[in-house]
Amino acid sequence: MKNRGLGVLVCLLALPLAAQRHKVSINAETPEGQLLQQIGQEEDAAKKAALAEQFVSQHPKHESIAWVYENMVHAYTKANQPAKAMEAGDKLLAIDPGDARTAHAALKAAEATKDPDAIKVWAVRTSDAARKAAQAPKTEDQEEEEWKAEVDFAKQLETYTEYSLYAAALQATDGKKKVELLETLEQRNPSSQYLAQAYTPIFVALQQAGDTANSVVVAEKVLAKEQNNEEMLLVVANHLLTQKQDPDKVLAYSAKMIDLMGSKPKPEGVADADWEKRKSHFMGVGHWMSGMIYSTQNKFAPADKSFRAALPYIQGNDQLLAGALFYLGVSNYRLKNIMDAIKFSEQCVAIKGNPYAAGAARNLKAIRSEYRVVQ
């Protein structure tokens, strides 16, 4: 993943630098002309930037103002003042929205700040500038090769802006910012090569940070396209179950997870025991979630079937097991399987400290009374 992005960057840097896009008109007999000369001749970045600021302050409407801003962007970049470089870039793009090279310089300045908001803004603006530049016709004063190089640069720059958003999303520490950067990348290019590379590592990072809400957002983006990641299926299905939302989707994702883990080959390098444990976890939870949905819908036969299927996989997980046993007791009572209803209810009561125990005990007492079953 990283190498592809760096490859784009290397290509961009390898292109021959074009002559400055903006022209300068100097009349050395005027104060402004002399100041322009000083700007052009000054090699110290900080001093060049200061001279450019002076010119902008004194001659804001001069015909060479774009050239001054162009010099200012590069001077501030060289002087390691990214905020000032972005400010100058903003002013220059207001004059020339198709200046892709200046936009690129401002984007690099934004990346230097590691500020996800700044990177998002400048990735979009640079993308816009690159698209304009890629469509720009050859001007009368351009050589054919120069024009082709600029168009090629613009196309590569467009791809680089996608990489910039992708890299920023990976690096962002705030889950909301990760999602915002991903969504910006989706908006700019829904088929970007970097989207597919970004989803899983960002999902994993959000999960590790305990950011369930944003994990669900990322997972749903992936599941809308393909459903072959058991972690994402589980996170979204469990979230919907907990929030009591979209029961049909919970059932669909649970079924998909069960089917996926039943047929998915063991990854290379994973021990057999570890893989069986993982499969059991996902298949057990999948059946359990299905049973919970069917129980809330009073669909007792499918609830009974789902929970019975879950039992072999959830032994030792008292939290899941207690719920499964409670609802198995209820379902079998409704299905007139009285002895099974008693058996499952007794097993639920026997699990100490579980939240279903009191309800199971009441049900057990009522069933025995109704059917005159002696304890």
Question: Where do the language-model regions lie?
Answer:
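N-terminal leader/linker segments that initiate helical-solenoid repeat arrays
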Residues: 17-71, 78, 101, 121, ...
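Terminal, low-structured helical/coil segments at or just beyond the last alpha-helical repeat
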Residues: 22-27, 160-163, 267-270, 280-286, ...
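Structural register within alpha-helical repeat arrays
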Residues: 35-38, 72, 106, 165-168, ...
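TPR-repeat structural position
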Residues: 45, 82, 116, 175-178, ...
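Short solvent-exposed coil/turn linkers within tandem alpha-helical repeat scaffolds
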Residues: 58-65, 94-102, 132-141, 156, ...
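TPR/TPR-like (Sel1-like) alpha-helical repeat modules
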Residues: 94, 111-135, 241, 252-262, ...
